[in-house]
From Swiss-Prot:
GO MF annotations in UniProt: NADH dehydrogenase activity; oxidoreductase activity, acting on NAD(P)H, quinone or similar compound as acceptor; quinone binding
Protein name: NADH-quinone oxidoreductase subunit H
GO biological process: aerobic respiration
Topology versus the membrane: Multi-pass membrane protein
Catalytic activity: a quinone + NADH + 5 H(+)(in) = a quinol + NAD(+) + 4 H(+)(out)
TM region(s), chain numbering: 4-24, 44-64, 78-98, 120-140, 165-185, 194-214, 255-275, 279-299, 312-332
One GO cellular component term noted in the UniProt record for this chain: plasma membrane
Gene it is expressed from: nuoH
Organism the protein comes from: Campylobacter jejuni (strain RM1221)
Assembly and binders: NDH-1 is composed of 14 different subunits. Subunits NuoA, H, J, K, L, M, N constitute the membrane sector of the complex.
Cellular location(s): Cell inner membrane
EC number assigned by the record: 7.1.1.-
Length: 332
């Protein structure tokens, strides 16, 4: 087999594996979230269908995907129909440039668990994942429903504001490492526990986590939907499979965000003592992913004015200050 044919086959297999695994994980995450929230609220959660309620996930999927697909008569039908697909596609495309595990050898060929190892991977991931909000805005606007439009507009304002916070935090990382490649950033943290960037950039870590909650539509910083204010927000008119596509895209973005935090701040997939790198990657990413559930259970929903004031009066000034301090540290 020629090198090009092997490369093409390898890339195709990687794409199929990523879609299959992360679509499954997105569904499994719903079960995990229900169990975690039940524990916080002193409930049991799903426990009737299958062992530990695991088959409840299958029952919910059957129910969701067999529901009638309703398109409102006064909506922009084409945009309304494709917006959920854009959301899911952008979430999965962003995973293409994220290295998941250490490289390994298969049939004499070195395999890197990444579809595209590009030198601007960080820019690619942030750009493609940010497009998920473009789908949210299109879906809300095309619904021609006041709650959907309000949710879409609130989400758009939030993502424009908090992208600045996340970008400034990441620029500090790039200044230290000297590269936009996620593989290079991972390798920068290969000298042991105290080489992790969370110790060199603790403020950037906090700022990026906050921006991540906005980008993934998670409580307490979710502005696109609120039962007490705008019903289901951008998703008010969606049902069945189309609502499920938004749902899969959101959870895939959450998983990608957890992996990205691990790569940027927590040592990535480097080995720790006698623990292999791939185990460390799974453990650390799962720990970050758990934060989504913990925050939803522990914190109240913030008002839009509180979210925006926090961004412009606190977070952006802190991000700029962190950037200036990092620049001085690099120069000196």
């Amino acid at each position: 087999m020629s090198d090009f044919a092997f490369f093409a086959l390898e890339a195709l297999i990687k794409c199929i594996i990523i879609i299959a695994i992360f679509a499954s994980l997105a569904g499994l995450a719903t079960y995990a979230e229900r169990k975690v929230l039940a524990y916080f609220q002193r409930r049991i959660g799903p426990d009737m269908v299958g062992p530990f309620g695991l088959i409840q996930l299958v029952a919910d999927m059957i129910k969701l995907f067999t529901k009638e697909d309703i398109i409102p008569s006064n909506s922009q039908k084409f945009i309304f129909a494709i917006a959920p697909l854009i959301s899911a596609i952008c979430a999965f495309v962003s995973l293409a440039a994220i290295p998941m595990l250490p490289e390994f050898t298969l049939f004499g060929k070195v395999i890197q668990p990444i579809v595209a190892d590009i030198n601007v991977a960080l820019l690619f991931v942030i750009g493609t994942s940010g497009l998920c909000f473009y789908a949210v805005f299109l879906g809300g606007l095309a619904s021609n429903n006041k709650w959907s439009i309000l949710g879409a507009a609130r989400g758009l304002v939030a993502i424009i504001s908090y992208e600045s916070v996340g970008a400034l935090a990441l620029i500090a990382i790039v200044m230290l490492v000297g590269s936009f490649s996620l593989v290079d950033i991972n390798n920068y943290q290969s000298d042991g526990f105290f080489s992790w960037l969370i110790f060199k950039q603790p403020l950037a870590f906090v700022l990026f986590i906050i921006a991540l909650f906005i980008e993934t539509n998670r409580t307490p910083l979710c502005l696109t939907e609120n039962d007490a204010e705008i019903v289901a927000g951008y998703g008010t008119e969606y049902s069945g499979l189309r609502w499920g596509m938004f749902f899969i895209g959101e959870y895939a973005s959450m998983i990608a965000g957890a992996i990205l935090v691990t790569l940027l701040f927590l040592g990535g997939f480097n080995s720790f003592w006698i623990i292999p790198g791939w185990i460390m990657m799974i453990v650390k990413s799962s720990f970050i992913f758990f934060w989504y559930f913990w925050a939803r259970a522990a914190f109240p929903q913030l008002r839009p004015d509180q979210v925006m004031k926090m961004c412009y009066l606190i977070l952006i000034p802190l991000a700029v200050l962190n950037l200036l301090i990092t620049a001085l540290a690099v120069l000196l």
